[in-house]
């Protein structure tokens, strides 16, 4: 048995912070998948023992794929699924051709974890419904559920783990991504630097806006509440941002920017 699949990054068309609850921030966001040259390729096959290969920047225990697999196994045990199915997950060789950077606001680790959970559910005929997969995904990381969903465009609420499909003409082939070299944004550090000025009360209106309208009527600072704190924590990022044209927007907590492909700007 060998299965291979591709996973793609996301960008946040908008990301608005509502308020802080405990250690984390409640937010609303529109996530869009971007299908281009930037992608990870994951292969899964049977092996004598578990093996995870890839150009990762963290210890195994912190790897999102490893975490997703452990949480999935515990969930299946709680459902009292066949022991042979759970045992087969212990003898997988997973190899990742890693191209999507982490700490870039593109869902680098969550992309792989969400894709793996979605495909393992199909490969092993686990028959988990979307809500069950979301329960697992939310324990892996906030962005994971967007990648489990396989939606091309979705609203994310709560801490980013509550996903709802947003019906619109997909932008997946109309966006291009720019990732600055050697700038890595810690999500935790950027959120810690965030200082709310006023409470945000327009969540419902924003969640109804088509993504294209957002990009055509708002600037990057207005669309993403994390841009300013990211620039405060990274002088090199601030230098780059100051040289970018208005057509560039900021994704997540950074460091990546994105825009509508210039050749297609006037197509609608």
Curated annotation (Swiss-Prot):
Active site location: 10, 143
EC numbers, comma separated = 2.7.1.148
Pathways involved: Isoprenoid biosynthesis; isopentenyl diphosphate biosynthesis via DXP pathway; isopentenyl diphosphate from 1-deoxy-D-xylulose 5-phosphate: step 3/6
Q: Catalyses which reaction?
A: 4-CDP-2-C-methyl-D-erythritol + ATP = 4-CDP-2-C-methyl-D-erythritol 2-phosphate + ADP + H(+)
Q: Which family does it belong to?
A: Belongs to the GHMP kinase family. IspE subfamily.
Role according to the record: Catalyzes the phosphorylation of the position 2 hydroxy group of 4-diphosphocytidyl-2C-methyl-D-erythritol.
**Protein name per Swiss-Prot or TrEMBL:** 4-diphosphocytidyl-2-C-methyl-D-erythritol kinase
Organism encoding this protein:
Helicobacter acinonychis (strain Sheeba)
Lineage, top ranks: Bacteria, Pseudomonadati, Campylobacterota, Epsilonproteobacteria, Campylobacterales
**Which gene is transcribed and translated to give this protein?**
ispE
